[in-house]
Amino acid sequence: MTGHVFTIAGGKGGVGKTTTAVNVGVAMQDAGYDVVIVDADLGMANLAAMLEIDYDTSLHEVLAERAAISDTLTEGPGGVTVVPGEQSLEAFADADPAKLRKVIKTLSNAYDIVFIDTGAGLSHEATVPLGLADSVLLVTTPDSVAIGDAGKTAQLAKRVDGEVIGTILTRAEEQSEIDEVETGVDHPLLAVIPEDSEATTNEPLVVNFPDTAAAEAYHHLATALERVLKGESVDTIVEEETEWFPSGDETEEEDEDDDSGGVLGLFS
């Protein structure tokens, strides 16, 4: 039985694709799955830099037929395996995105779960991972441009036979922002990740700051994806989320004790 391939995509840069791949990957490793995270952002790879890990061989070298995928496997935080990318323009020029198919097939035969972290835009190298996925996860912020780009990515995924199973909203603080995403992206909302000042600077949050609302949200997402792997429908999972933010008297009482904002009430 081959592993499940999740492609993390979104169109716009800076929405939290890499952060999501890292945190949900570590969370699922912690849940007992053997996980590998692939930095397929061929133009601006940043996974290794974000995690501050050293590596000997990059994915770019494999795609340029100068190394084997086994040479790239690097130990990451929380026990996950990382396939790092390279940042030089020369490496980008030599890498052939079409060879990513063989790489992902090899990894899916060796791991329970493969997370593909993709680049921004709708270029060829950003499109290839969409067609290789068993499931595509869209990541967006409440920003209207990001929402629009996520929608375009979903359309592109459909053209290359990629199945988008849901959307992950980052940096949301109000119900109105959730409504905008659900209207702008025609796919179920699987998770809401609150803004966290430690994100992108002290990753992974689920290891370094496990008690934060953001870390809890990533674990919540990992649980949802685990249910997907076990055959539950996304609609069933999403229907159980009656509200992403607390409301009414409970919220007012929390606000009296903590004036730091509604996102701290996520998933309570």
Where does each model-flagged region fall?
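Haloarchaeal acidic low-complexity proteome signature biased toward cell-envelope/secretome components but also
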Residues: 1-33, 43, 53, 62, ...
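Short coil/turn connectors at secondary-structure junctions
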Residues: 2-4, 31-34, 77-79, 110-111, ...
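Hydrophobic/aromatic beta-strand patches that form the interior of the parallel beta-sheet core
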Residues: 6, 38, 81-83, 137, ...
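P-loop/Walker-type NTP enzyme "switch/lid" segment
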Residues: 10, 40-109, 201-204
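Short, conserved catalytic or interaction motifs in soluble domains
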Residues: 10, 17, 40, 135, ...
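Helical mechanochemical/support elements of P-loop NTPase systems and associated helical scaffolds
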Residues: 43, 55, 65, 96-100, ...
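Conserved catalytic-core segment of NTP-binding enzymes
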Residues: 109, 113-201
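C-terminal lobe/tail of nucleotide-utilizing enzymes
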Residues: 159-268
